[in-house]
């Protein structure tokens, strides 16, 4: 009896060992519909944001396409692929990434940490620079909980951007969030490159979202340069990738900046562009049936913008900071575009680039009259503020009467402010212009302003 029991227990142990070698059970659903950008699947219960794998045929081989749950209707899941969908068949099997399909899947974990410095990655953390995957064991979720506003450090310190017009006339504070409003071809990328090279920050995170592939390479190699790239992390999600990957790229760039901020470092975050991020969300929202609102943008777009922007800024007292510059494309130089209007309301200031100035060869083409830094008054002295006000008054007076002065119709002495503007105009114009490879730090910028207004 004992021998038989021993034999039976041994057989049971062998059976258990063989069972352990079998592959884990994978729940899967089936693809039932493909319309435009969205695929529909049934048979799985997964939360929004969960990652799925769809089987596709590539000749005799079966390959996998990564997708994400962007919505559901009853038992139907709406999926948006992150890759090319060619070869996907009706009824193709759909797996949850964790293999269970029970809704218990955790959020995405993407690489973080100092090992990312000098690297160029896509929105999913995969290398685009031809190098191996980042050598880091540190990972983190893509989305973090909202920051308690009462725990943020106030904006108290000036950020030296290396650009004279910004330093002196549109002073930016460490932890401020600024918008760079510009149409196409007015020097936006060049100005961003100058700030990336010359800004006094520990780390630079660049998010190139929805841009042309040629512009991505040009920005990294020529505008950012080797010096800027050494202390930078570049996340690139060009225009030809999935809208989901473009949105994820913006969130990932922000998450990397948050990670460095939490390490006590001061980060410069450059996002080019916030408009392409909004357009990517519009593509997704319209594809899953959300009704359009203002100029074709669904309401979810205007909810996503502040959720992204509010993640930047100062950390807790004694911690690091994220100073962010978001570019906003103004189509046809329309400052009332809905995205531009929404961004202006949620940012801490805006720098407007003028096509008129760019066409006149005036670089950087910053329209000082239309630009503002909301944190500036808390950062500068009364004397500095008085000089800035006088500078803007003289600039505005000259611009309003430029035609009269040009044709000789203005009689000197009619307007004391205009008389002073005409006298100082060469100095004002020279102050606002700066070479691409010329650095003007904070002290030099103030000294240049002092030379124009020594008695103010």
Curated annotation (Swiss-Prot):
Q: Does the keyword Phosphoprotein apply?
A: no
Molecular-function GO terms, alphabetical: ATP binding; ATP hydrolysis activity; identical protein binding
Keyword Nuclease tagged:
no
**What effect is documented for mutating residue 188 to E?**
Loss of flagellum
Q: Name one Pfam family in it.
A: ATP-synt_ab
Q: Which domain of life is it from?
A: Bacteria
Reactions that this protein is recorded to catalyse: ATP + H2O + 4 H(+)(in) = ADP + phosphate + 5 H(+)(out)
Which terms are listed as keywords in the entry?
A: ATP synthesis, ATP-binding, Bacterial flagellum biogenesis, Bacterial flagellum protein export, Cytoplasm, Hydrogen ion transport, Ion transport, Nucleotide-binding, Protein transport, Translocase, Transport
GO terms classed as biological process: bacterial-type flagellum assembly; bacterial-type flagellum-dependent cell motility; protein secretion by the type III secretion system; proton motive force-driven ATP synthesis; proton transmembrane transport
What's any one GO cellular component for it? Answer: cytoplasm
Query: Where found?
Result: Cytoplasm
**UniProt binding sites for ATP:** 182-189
Please state the protein's primary subcellular location: cytoplasm
Catalytic activity, EC: 7.1.2.2
Alphabetical list of PANTHER family matching this protein: ATP SYNTHASE, FLAGELLUM-SPECIFIC ATP SYNTHASE
Q: What does this protein do?
A: Probable catalytic subunit of a protein translocase for flagellum-specific export, or a proton translocase involved in local circuits at the flagellum. May be involved in a specialized protein export pathway that proceeds without signal peptide cleavage.
Q: Which family does it belong to?
A: Belongs to the ATPase alpha/beta chains family.
Q: What is this protein called?
A: Flagellum-specific ATP synthase
Q: What organism, scientifically named, is this protein from?
A: Salmonella typhimurium (strain LT2 / SGSC1412 / ATCC 700720)
């Amino acid at each position: 009896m004992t021998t038989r029991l021993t034999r039976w227990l041994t057989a049971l142990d062998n059976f258990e060992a063989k069972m352990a070698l079998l592959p884990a059970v994978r729940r899967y659903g089936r693809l039932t519909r493909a319309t435009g950008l969205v695929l529909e699947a049934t048979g799985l219960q997964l939360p929004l944001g969960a990652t799925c794998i769809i089987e596709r045929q590539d000749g005799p081989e079966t390959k996998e396409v990564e997708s994400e749950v962007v919505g559901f209707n009853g038992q139907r899941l709406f999926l948006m692929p992150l890759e090319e969908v060619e070869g996907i068949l009706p009824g193709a099997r759909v797996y949850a990434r964790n293999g269970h399909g029970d809704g218990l899947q955790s959020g995405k974990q993407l690489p973080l940490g100092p090992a990312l410095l000098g690297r160029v990655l896509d929105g999913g953390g995969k290398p685009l620079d031809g190098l191996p995957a980042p050598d880091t064991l540190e990972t983190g979720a893509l989305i973090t909980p909202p920051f308690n506003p009462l725990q943020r450090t106030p904006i108290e310190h000036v950020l030296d951007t290396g650009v004279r017009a910004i330093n002196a006339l549109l002073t930016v504070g460490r932890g401020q969030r600024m918008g760079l409003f510009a149409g196409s071809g007015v020097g936006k990328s060049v100005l961003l490159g100058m700030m990336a090279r010359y800004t006094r920050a520990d780390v630079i995170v660049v998010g190139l979202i929805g841009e042309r592939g040629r512009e991505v390479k040009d920005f990294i190699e020529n505008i950012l340069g080797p010096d800027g790239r050494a202390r930078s992390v570049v996340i690139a999600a060009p225009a030809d990738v999935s809208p989901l990957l473009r949105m994820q790229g913006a969130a990932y760039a922000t998450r990397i900046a948050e990670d460095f901020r939490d390490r006590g470092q001061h980060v410069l975050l450059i996002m080019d562009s916030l408009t392409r991020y909004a357009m990517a969300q519009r593509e997704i929202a319209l594809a899953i049936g959300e009704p359009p609102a203002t100029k074709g943008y669904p309401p979810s777009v205007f909810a996503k913008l502040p959720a992204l922007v509010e993640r930047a800024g100062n950390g807790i007292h004694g911690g690091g900071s994220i100073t962010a510059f978001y570019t906003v494309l103004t189509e046809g130089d329309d400052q009332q575009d809905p995205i531009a209007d929404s961004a202006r309301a949620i940012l801490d200031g805006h720098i407007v680039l003028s096509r008129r100035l760019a066409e006149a060869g005036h670089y950087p083409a910053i329209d000082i009259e239309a630009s503002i830094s909301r944190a500036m008054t808390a950062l500068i002295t009364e004397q500095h503020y008085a000089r800035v006000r006088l500078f803007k008054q003289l600039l505005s007076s000259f611009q309003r009467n430029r035609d009269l002065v040009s044709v000789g119709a203005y009689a000197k002495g009619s307007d004391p402010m205009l008389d002073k503007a005409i006298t100082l105009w060469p100095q004002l114009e020279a102050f606002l212009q700066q070479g691409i490879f010329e650095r003007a730090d904070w002290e030099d910028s103030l000294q240049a302003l002092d030379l124009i207004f020594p008695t103010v």
